[in-house]
Design a protein with these regions (language model features):
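Substrate-recognition/specificity elements adjacent to catalytic centers across diverse enzyme folds
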Residues: 1-96, 104-106, 111-119, 424, ...
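Active-site-adjacent "gating/activation" loops or surface patches in catalytic cores
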Residues: 63-67, 76-83, 87-97, 197-215, ...
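Structured core elements
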Residues: 72, 85-86, 129, 247-248, ...
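Long, compositionally biased non-active-site segments enriched in small/hydrophobic residues and glycine
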Residues: 1-46, 250-598
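Generic recognition of flexible, low-complexity loop/linker segments
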Residues: 57-61, 69-75, 82, 107-110, ...
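Loop/turn elements at helix/coil->beta-strand transitions in domains of secreted/extracellular proteins
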Residues: 81-82, 126-128, 242-244, 302, ...
Length: 598
């Protein structure tokens, strides 16, 4: 059942709110007085809340579920002279619900809402559109507090002061298996830096983050009514869009990349990715950076902006983006990623594009990560002695990869071999990359020749075991399937499914499809990545095309349970009916919530 406070617990709409950066295991260990041995070794003792989308991608984590793409095209590069917008969040399937929300007081927004929220998070109205991408901004910090226990209570050291630790008891009702409720009470602690979330040796650790849920909720809703860029920027003065960047376009022809607009000012000589000394007042936040102080790109001469969870320093290409040297290091802790490289390769040479062309860009088949990864493999194979047993075994697969255009396709054997090999190579070097926090693609490309070749042997063996032959087309492996409306879906190789060509964003696929064998299957089934996708043109009237993974109903057998699946699998976006006459012409009927559906 919905309760009003729930909206305040998740007020900005992203994949995970800022509070999700706090690790529950460490939180539980602190409040249950359990040892934190797992956090006291190696990188485990580093900041528990710095994992952001682009860093996870660099480390080779399952990135297809935590990425997003946004492109905005100005009249300079639009065939129609109208601004265009690509809205392409990568989330868990069915986590974004497509809706058109109207009121008699000026609300008229279309797009995707996150479960449990009442505002359109990524979408458009009649004259403006917004796409949010997870940011690598460093705006969540940890402060190590020196705790002093005295007879009259708990204190923490701050400069020459001893300040009291704020203590509060939180009461939580817990539902039992039989439907009854029990009441549990938990003590909580906080300092002026924020709540205590874990311990680091004998110090307590407070987390500092954006704690303005009411303002964040107002900003999230108000921006859906913004008519143009000026109104959108005015709403951003709330500074509560903390974990996301924005790609924007409007009917006046404006486009913009807008960096996360919650960026605390702090010392640039300290590494805030690690906990800092909370007893030193000079480590404190010193207010927030203004919008003008952020690495935005507004109406650049390129005629386009893009963000793929990469850094802001390529938002408008190599010549016209913000310059990294002009900003403190905490302004963005990410880097370029494979999707960003892919986007730049498409946008920089582009002369002009229309709405259909924007769809083509969004589903471009190139996998640029393999441009970096495959040459070292080819060298390793070429250096094998002619009489080496592996030479004959691997030669046919190497020939497939050498002839491959490095573009995905459902009938491509090379796509399957490359991805299986890439997965095996990533597994082989994962621990080294994580331990040193090195870029995963770089570590893979620099792996020893023997490691490269062993990964290919492992990939071919896995293909033969799972599918009978290593020469299996990618579409026989990579599938879309929806059998129920459950949140935790089950998959079945014997049940109907659809081939999907696009793949993990780790390889640079702009259209992302996070697939893997699941619950004992041989085939790979996607459950994250492209969820809601839309392209929008802002002319005298707004035009849009969109697609949602599977369908909008969660009820198997309902006409809308999987009616979009075939279109989704091939990137065939349908027309959006935005205006009343179009809605009336295509409606099956009307009803109010609680009434039987037509």
């Amino acid at each position: 059942r919905f309760e009003p406070w729930m909206a305040l617990s998740f007020s900005e709409g992203s994949i995970g709110g800022d509070i999700e950066r706090v690790r529950p295991e460490a939180l539980a260990a602190f409040y249950e007085n359990q040892p934190l041995s797992q956090w006291d070794q190696g990188t485990g003792a580093r900041s528990a809340i710095r994992a952001v989308a682009s860093q996870g991608e660099a480390l080779g984590l399952p990135s297809a579920s935590v990425g997003s793409n946004g492109f905005a095209i100005s009249p300079l590069k639009s065939e129609s002279g109208n601004a265009l917008l690509l809205i392409n969040p990568h989330t868990s399937f069915y986590f974004r619900h497509e809706a058109h929300v109207k009121s008699d007081e000026g609300l008229n927004a279309y797009g995707a809402s996150t479960w449990g929220q009442f505002f359109v998070y990524q979408g458009f109205n009649e004259t403006a559109g917004w796409m949010h991408t997870s940011s690598a901004v460093d705006n969540i910090d940890e402060f190590e507090e020196t705790i002093v226990r005295q007879e009259d209570g708990l204190f923490y050291r701050y400069g020459d002061e001893l300040r009291p630790v704020e203590q509060k008891t939180v009461t939580v009702r817990l539902r039992q298996d039989d439907g009854t409720f029990t009441v549990e009470r938990y003590p909580t602690y906080r300092t002026h830096h924020g709540p205590i979330v874990r311990a680091e040796g004998d110090r307590w650790v407070a987390v500092a983050l954006m704690e303005e849920p009411r303002k964040a909720l107002i900003q999230s809703y108000a921006r859906t009514k913004a008519k143009n860029l000026d109104e959108f920027l005015e709403i951003m003065e709330s500074h509560t869009n903390s974990s996301n960047n924005t790609v924007f376009a409007d009917a006046a022809g404006n486009i913009a990349y807008l960096h996360s607009n919650f960026v605390p000012k702090r010392r640039s000589d300290l590494d805030y990715l690690n906990p800092v000394d909370g007893s030193d007042p000079s480590t404190d936040w010193q207010g927030l950076h203004t919008i003008e102080e952020s690495p935005n790109s507004i109406n650049p001469p390129t005629g386009w902006v893009q963000n793929t969870n990469n850094w802001p320093y390529s938002a408008a290409g190599t010549e016209h983006s913000p310059r990294q040297k002009d900003y403190p290091p905490y302004m963005d802790s990410g880097s370029e990623n494979a999707r960003g490289i892919h986007a730049l390769a498409l946008l920089e040479p582009m002369s002009a594009v229309d709405l259909d062309g924007l769809v083509t860009l969004a589903y471009d088949e190139a996998l640029p990560a393999f441009d970096e990864l495959l040459p070292p493999l080819f060298t390793a194979f070429a250096d094998l002695p002619g009489d080496a047993p592996a030479k004959a075994r691997l030669a046919p697969a190497i020939a497939q990869l050498e002839a491959w255009d490095r573009r995905y396709a459902i009938d491509s054997v090379a796509t399957a071999v490359a991805i299986f090999w890439g997965d095996a190579l990533r597994d082989a070097v994962r621990d080294e990359a994580r331990a040193n926090r090195w870029n995963m693609l770089t570590v893979m490309a620099e792996a020893a020749p023997a490691v490269q070749l062993k990964a290919l042997e492992d990939a071919l063996a896995r293909l033969e075991t799972g599918f009978g032959t290593w020469e299996t087309p990618w579409g026989e492996i990579n599938r879309f399937q929806r059998l129920s409306g459950a949140i935790d879906l089950r998959y079945d190789d014997s049940a109907p499914s659809l081939p999907v060509a696009f793949t993990s964003s780790f390889w640079g696929s702009l259209a992302a499809f996070g697939a893997a064998p699941r619950n004992g299957t041989q085939r790979w089934y996607g459950n994250r990545g492209n969820s809601f996708v839309a392209v929008v043109e802002f002319g005298e009237k707004v035009r849009a095309r969109a697609i949602t993974a599977g369908g909008l109903s969660r009820i198997p057998g309902d006409r809308h349970f999987d009616d979009q699946a075939e279109r989704y699998a091939v990137g065939d976006l349908r027309e959006v009916y935005f205006y009343p006459d179009a809605i009336a012409a295509h409606s099956l009927g009307t009803y109010r919530p609680g009434e039987p559906r037509p």
